Curated annotation (Swiss-Prot):
Cytoplasmic side: 469-479
GO cellular component: host cell endoplasmic reticulum membrane; membrane; viral envelope; virion membrane
Gene Ontology MF: a single term: protein dimerization activity
Keyword terms, alphabetized: Clathrin-mediated endocytosis of virus by host, Cleavage on pair of basic residues, Disulfide bond, Fusion of virus membrane with host endosomal membrane, Fusion of virus membrane with host membrane, Glycoprotein, Host endoplasmic reticulum, Host membrane, Host-virus interaction, Inhibition of host innate immune response by virus, Membrane, Suppressor of RNA silencing, Transmembrane, Transmembrane helix, Viral attachment to host cell, Viral envelope protein, Viral immunoevasion, Viral penetration into host cytoplasm, Virion, Virus endocytosis by host, Virus entry into host cell, Zinc
Residues carrying a glycan: N154
Domain of life of the native organism: Viruses
Stretches in topological domain Extracellular: 1-447
Region annotation Fusion peptide: where it falls in the sequence: 98-111
Entry protein name: Genome polyprotein
Disulfide bonds listed in the record: C3-C30, C60-C116, C60-C121, C74-C105, C92-C116, C92-C121, C186-C290, C307-C338
A GO biological process held by the record: virion attachment to host cell
Length: 496
């Protein structure tokens, strides 16, 4: 699956009868959804971008100077005049020069002198700013069912589907083929202040340099370089790249300050690099909060017969996925399609299946299958696939796993923020409380009771509540009632 190849992976486990779960998706992360009686899915935020954002300013990094002209007057003859002074696109400077008999003036003294030069910009030497429009930013969410096929990190799963969202998007329904339909309703949020963010892009050259950066608007507007708006042929403040020498009689030299690309690149050291793909300008941070509807999903292969246990062979022996799960792949030489008999037992309990399958109902298909992912309790275990067996030691501890999943649940609830609560009605408020409990404690509950059936969990919750009602000690009574209520809520709830 896609999530097994990413470092930032989260698990959301639906309870019995779950029809809807709430996910927090961020760039670079991936969430695996598991629910009893439903196929597992990987969901991730693939990209945040805007196509062809509006230009704000263009800066010139290297001036192109031409048509230099100088005019001078003798002392007492008035100011020197050039018609170019009144022309747009020229840079001029007035000064005083020493005049006398040696340079054709009858009087000694200071005479007026003016120099003008036409200023343009060298080709491929512009830095352009682009601004984002929050209403036009597209958030791409991808969904991939766990089909039992191994897919390498650089390959694309044939069942992968894509949904796009903006601030005004409605619910999207994706068809996952034989696995049914899944609905997505996502609220989007960028991770940057779009009003104060500019994408600074250099003209593309053959140099192997970053071409775009994500900068602050005030910093961008304060750049001491010639600038113009898109479509305007003339540069404002072109004198910033022009230097005039000291005047000598009727002569004033004009100097080009040269290419400022290196100076700009030095100033951009440490600034986040922006990713541009064609006309898509990507944001580096942001998240979406999605309500995922599972009610129309269906399990594939429930009508298959069980595979012949003696005809399996390891293709990839069990391996740690890096996400507190175990992944493996088998081949099968018998009649296809069929269901893979897979289980795991802990040391000292040979009759209790302790495997929590991330790949539900693993199957061998005519054209693939055989990839299995499972979660095992910490300690010594034996994995069985048909007649194959493999000794496995799962690192960690049950308490540590509970704390880790609870911490992630609190992080999810924090990111969802105000959207997690509905104060419009009493029913909505209590529903919000249920969702919050599932978001924070769902992973921990699954870690503790993952191998316990629905009926035992229900009876346990009822028993704890009954003890709470019949205990005379107030502290013990409240403790039993709270524990029983949580077990019942997590067992019977349909929101996660």
């Amino acid at each position: 699956s896609r999530c097994t190849h990413l470092e930032n992976r989260d698990f959301v486990t639906g309870t019995q009868g779950t029809t809807r779960v709430t996910l927090v998706l961020e760039l670079g992360g991936c969430v695996t959804i598991t629910a009893e009686g439903k196929p597992s899915m990987d969901v991730w935020l693939d990209a945040i971008y805007q196509e062809s954002p509006a230009k704000t300013r263009e800066y010139c990094l290297h001036a192109k100077l031409s048509e230099t002209k100088v005019a001078a007057r003798c002392p007492t003859m008035g100011p020197a005049v050039l018609t170019e002074e009144r022309q747009i696109g020229t840079v001029c400077k007035r000064d005083q020069s020493d005049r006398g008999w040696g340079n054709h003036c009858g009087l000694f003294g200071k005479g007026s002198i003016v120099a003008c030069v036409k200023a343009a910009c060298e080709a491929k030497k512009k830095a352009t700013g682009y601004v984002y429009d929050a209403n036009k930013i597209v958030y791409t969410v991808k969904v991939e069912p766990h089909t039992g096929d191994y897919v390498a990190a650089n390959e694309t799963h044939k069942g992968r589907k894509t949904a796009t969202f903006t601030v005004s998007s409605e619910k999207t329904i994706l068809t996952l083929g034989e696995y049914g339909d899944v609905s997505l309703l996502c609220r989007v949020a960028s991770g940057v202040d779009l009003a104060q963010t500019i994408i600074l892009e250099l003209d593309k050259t053959a140099e192997h340099l970053p071409t775009a950066w994500q900068v602050h608007r005030d910093w961008f507007n304060d750049l001491a370089l010639p600038w113009k708006h898109d479509g305007n042929p003339h540069w404002n403040n072109a004198e910033r790249l022009v230097e005039f020498g000291a005047p000598h009689a009727v002569k004033m030299d004009v100097y080009n300050l040269g290419d400022q690309t290196g100076v700009l690149l030095k100033a951009l050291a440490g600034v986040p690099v922006a990713h541009i793909e064609g006309n898509k300008y990507h944001l580096k941070s942001g998240h979406v909060t999605c309500e995922v509807g599972l009610e129309k999903l269906k399990m594939k292969g429930l009508t298959y017969t069980m595979c012949d246990k003696s005809k399996f062979a390891w293709k990839r022996t069990p391996t740690d996925s890096g996400h507190d799960t175990v992944v493996m792949e088998v081949t099968f030489s018998g009649s296809k399609p069929c269901r893979i008999p897979v289980r795991a037992v802990a040391h000292g309990s040979p009759d209790v299946n302790v495997a929590m399958l991330i790949t539900p109902n693993p199957t061998i298909e005519n054209d693939g299958g055989g990839f299995i992912e499972m979660q095992l309790p910490p300690g010594d275990n034996i994995i069985y696939v048909g007649e194959l067996s493999h000794q496995w030691f799962q690192t960690g501890s049950s308490i540590g796993r509970v704390f880790q999943t609870t911490r992630k649940g609190i992080e999810r609830l924090t990111v969802i923020g105000e959207h997690a609560w509905d104060f419009g009605s009493a029913g909505g408020f209590f529903s919000s409380i249920g969702k919050a409990v599932h978001t924070v404690l769902g992973g921990a509950f699954n870690s503790i009771f993952g191998g316990v059936g629905f009926l035992p969990k229900l009876l346990m919750g009822v028993a704890l509540a009954w003890l709470g009602l019949n205990t005379r000690n107030p502290t013990m009574s409240m403790s039993f009632l709270l524990a029983g209520g949580l077990v019942l809520a997590m067992t019977l709830g349909v929101g996660a």
